[in-house]
Amino acid sequence: MSSFDIVSELTIHEVRNAVENANRVLSTRYDFRGVDATIELNEKNELIRVTTESDFQLEQLIEILIGCCIKRGIQHTSLDIPSESEHHGKLYTKEIKLKQGIKSDMAKQLVKLIKGSKIKVQAQIQGDSIRITGKSRDDLQSTIQLVKNAELGQPLQFNNFRD
């Protein structure tokens, strides 16, 4: 029986590098001179705090951060960006959560998608990952294509492929 795992993982050091690059870009931008603007990574809580003086500048900071994340190989769908910003005094703040691990409702949706496709594989939810087992390698590859083509709103990786 061949098998592989579907996971959703972020390499935290790549996220740290993206935040540092975004701060470097921020320090060179002319429109942010003299503005109290920061991008901070909290690795313990897995979130990025973006703070600046206006809502418009906040959106620009988020675009800078997304661009730096894409350059580092982090998909923008792994960032859970809230639609509303918090306003404290003269500063606007957004706390961007990092999506890591497959939540139970997403896992159930994936298993339902795979079973509904009539591909001869079994899907098992194992904590933050999903184990897919099947008799032929072709079935597993068609399952990978099915999951890649599905719009799930979260980046997924395939690892631990065993023949």
Curated annotation (Swiss-Prot):
Query: Pfam family of this protein, just one?
Result: DUF520
Q: Which UniProt keywords apply?
A: Nucleotide-binding
- From the UniProt record, which GO molecular function terms apply? nucleotide binding
Q: What is this protein called?
A: Nucleotide-binding protein HAPS_2236
Q: Which SUPFAM superfamilies match?
A: YajQ-like (SSF89963)
* UniProt cross-references to PANTHER family, sorted A to Z: UPF0234 PROTEIN YAJQ
Query: Taxonomically, which superkingdom?
Result: Bacteria
Query: Which function does this protein serve?
Result: Nucleotide-binding protein.
What family does the Swiss-Prot or TrEMBL record give for this protein? Answer: Belongs to the YajQ family.
Listed under GO cellular component are: cytosol
Q: Does the keyword S-adenosyl-L-methionine apply?
A: no
